[in-house]
A protein has these predicted regions:
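Structural preference for solvent-exposed beta-strand-turn elements
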Residues: 12, 16-226
Length: 226
């Protein structure tokens, strides 16, 4: 993916009116502190995303996919991140492109906001119940992208959000954040409850991993780099 530096203060309308190129129209990153701003535009989607890892859990999300908006709001609330997302995609063909591209942007934002990862806890895990559903999430800010997903719903959907979109989102996020992510559904129940537990578990695990260890000053690896 080609990234170019430019001002983050570009409206989604301005991007939509720009002249398209064959694939990626534009993408830009700005990362003051533990914040990141991503603008990504293709023929299929236009995504603007702002992330503050040291936020208060505030979310302002509009992707055109209501259930997905709710899940991203849960990530912000349970991770204590501030998250703003604006996405416009080819929803007439389904939500796949929009969900995947938001995952790409959130992963890229995480990678940029974390910088060289000095002083971080690095690892995080959570076991989250949602009534009858139970989900385990474990992650490592390893610099090595890997995603594993076991036991999740298959062939179900709610409000146009299909079960297959859950792994698609997290795979895109893990690849672009360069993190190792394991999601295991230990007890599957109602589709909404199961997916909600997955997103909450991810948020809780990530909140732990990106926390700063006051006793650590270097990169949390004997290699000296992640």
């Amino acid at each position: 993916m080609l990234f170019c530096l430019r001002s983050c203060h570009v409206s989604l309308e301005d991007k939509l009116q720009s002249e398209p190129s064959p694939e990626l129209i534009s993408s830009s990153i700005s990362t003051p502190g533990r914040r990141a701003a991503i603008d990504r535009s293709t023929r299929e989607t236009q995504v603007t995303l702002r992330l503050d890892l040291d936020g208060t859990g505030g979310a302002d999300v509009r992707t055109g996919v209501g259930f997905f908006d709710h899940m991203l709001e849960l990530v912000a609330a349970h991770g204590l991140f501030d998250l703003t997302v604006r996405a416009e995609g080819d929803l007439e063909t389904g939500a796949h492109h929009t969900v995947e591209d938001v995952g790409i942007c959130l992963g890229a934002a995480l990678a940029q906001a974390l910088g060289d990862k000095r002083g971080l806890i690095r690892y995080g895990s959570a076991v989250v119940p949602m009534d009858e559903a139970l989900v385990l999430v474990a992650l490592d800010l390893s610099g090595r992208p890997y995603f594993a997903y076991e036991g999740g719903p298959v062939g179900e959907a709610v409000a146009g959000f299909e079960a297959s979109l859950v792994p698609e989102f997290f795979r895109a996020l893990a690849n672009n954040a360069k993190l190792t992510l394991h999601v295991r559904v230990l007890a599957r129940g109602d589709f909404h409850h199961t997916v909600e537990a997955v997103f909450k578990g991810f948020a809780r695990a990530l909140r732990q991993a990106v926390s700063v260890d006051p006793r650590a000053y270097g990169v949390p690896s004997t290699k000296g780099v992640l």
